[in-house]
UniProtKB/Swiss-Prot annotation:
Organism annotation: Deinococcus geothermalis (strain DSM 11300 / CIP 105573 / AG-3a)
Entry keyword annotation includes Protein biosynthesis: yes
Database matches in InterPro entries: EF-4, EFG_II, EFG_III/V, EFG_V-like, EFTu-like_2, G_TR_CS, LepA_C_sf, LepA_CTD
Protein name from the UniProt record: Elongation factor 4
Reactions listed under catalytic activity: GTP + H2O = GDP + phosphate + H(+)
Amino acid sequence: MNVRNFSIIAHVDHGKSTLADRILERLGAMGERDKRDQTLDTLELERERGITIKSTPIRLTYRRANGEEYTFNLIDTPGHVDFGYEVSRSLAACEGVLLLVDASQGVEAQTIVNAYLAIDNNLEIIPVVNKIDLPAADPEGAAQELEEVIGIPAEEAVFASGKTGQGVDQILEAIVERIPPPPGDPQAPLKALIFDSFYDAYQGVILFVRVLEGTLKPKQKIMLFSNGKSFEVDKVGTFSPGLVVGDALSAGAVGWVAASIKDIHDAQVGDTITEKDRPTAEPFPGFKPAQPVVFSGLYPTDTEDYRKLREALEKLKLNDAAFTFEPETSEALGFGFRCGFLGLLHAEIVQERLEREFDLDLIATAPAVVYRVTLTNGEVFETQNPAEFPTRDRIARVEEPYIKLSIMLPEEYVGPVMQLLQERRGNMVTMNYVGKRVELIYEVPFAEILYDFHDRLKSISRGYASMDYEQIGYREGDLRKVDILVNGEVVDALAVIVHEDKAYSLGRKIVDKMAEVIPRQLFPVPVQAAIGGKIIARATVKAYRKDVLAKCYGGDITRKKKLLEKQKKGRARMKQIGTVEVPQEAFLAVLSTEE
């Protein structure tokens, strides 16, 4: 069977989508009219940021010099650390991968992680050194690094350039020769892996599948393993980019299925499809519902939009298996949703897609991780919302998630980066030298890298450092909840959970920032940061002042005192009943103090 299923994996920005464009062009899948960059990046946002978020598959035909025809299924994958689960599912649908390395930058943190993912899935790896047309390129050096770090022999590497198209023919030949054809018996009971899905207004949920065994065809009754629900297949087909209707998908094929599935939650990515009357013995292993690790509240600026936001989140969840949300209310912001994401980039993209595609105006609260709290009565519970954090006298201990962080960087930046990691409470595990570069491995509390760690890392290393991380479980920490009070009232949406050592400085920054953005009232407004009952920082928004003495020319001092006293009493009365509106900018200001 002349079929090859493969995927391209690389570190962000190593030219994966551009190389995919050249392969499509060489195989005639792009007419002159379609020639735009990053053909496989379908979301407007992906093209704008130049990153791949959703995995997009495509079917191609390759004719060798001797006239043999091969069908290639290329599954494009995201390269960003947040979308690791998407990558792992796309890889499960392949037999081999092209592992791209930028000739001018060498092996980066994610290259290593992606390579190990491929090795774990027993995939054939074809190393490709890309961007050899760059003046700073050192293809032999990059191939050598691959051998040192991952153990892929340097002589196996194919040198190519996604820009000029050089080396594309060698890559195509390598795919035919090195990647094995897909196994599987078309006569066996049906077994197909869902590696992505999206919602279509007319056909319901459309599943992207890799058929492992058996044959999938219209009118068939299929069943989903994870929940036992069954559906009838309406249409099947392949991708060329865009959905093309076909007759059937047999073992080894990659394609799509429409089966009038109305609810997105029925079709989980990573689930196995089988035939209802003749089910396969066991599902494809490794299915795990994606676990969100970063949480943030999303609130509509206009409370009227609550329903609209809910519908938008439902629709987005359709295409994004890893995103979760549940309703929550805040005294300060009204009704909204607590949303879970795979990471910060994921959170940013979801928010941007909501604002763009559904025309919503949103406020996001500070991102938080999931803390595990043990109370004095022995009860254990998890919370990611600082507003739900219990008071200090009820807490026996608090644990926070830690990550194993690996950073690749040129050796001259090691000092400043280690200092940054020390500030972020990191513990060093090991340090490896790879040529002129260093791999640092640290264990760091996840919360410490949430806000601006990546930006700081990039600026300290002039953009040369790259990072990747994985969760390694919970550890105990001295964490405190800092409450922010405006005019004596606690503003729940502004609470933050922070390590004891940083509580004072963070509280100070927040109150100073808040005092700048809260509009002045007719009475002075204190803004305070508190841990439990203890105030640790305060700033005051000065009052507007009416000049009550304007009418007194010269004259008696007692008269002036009387007027000032009267003004003071009026203010005191106003302060008791006056409420202070905390404006939108104040919430955003808190997020930006996180430096």
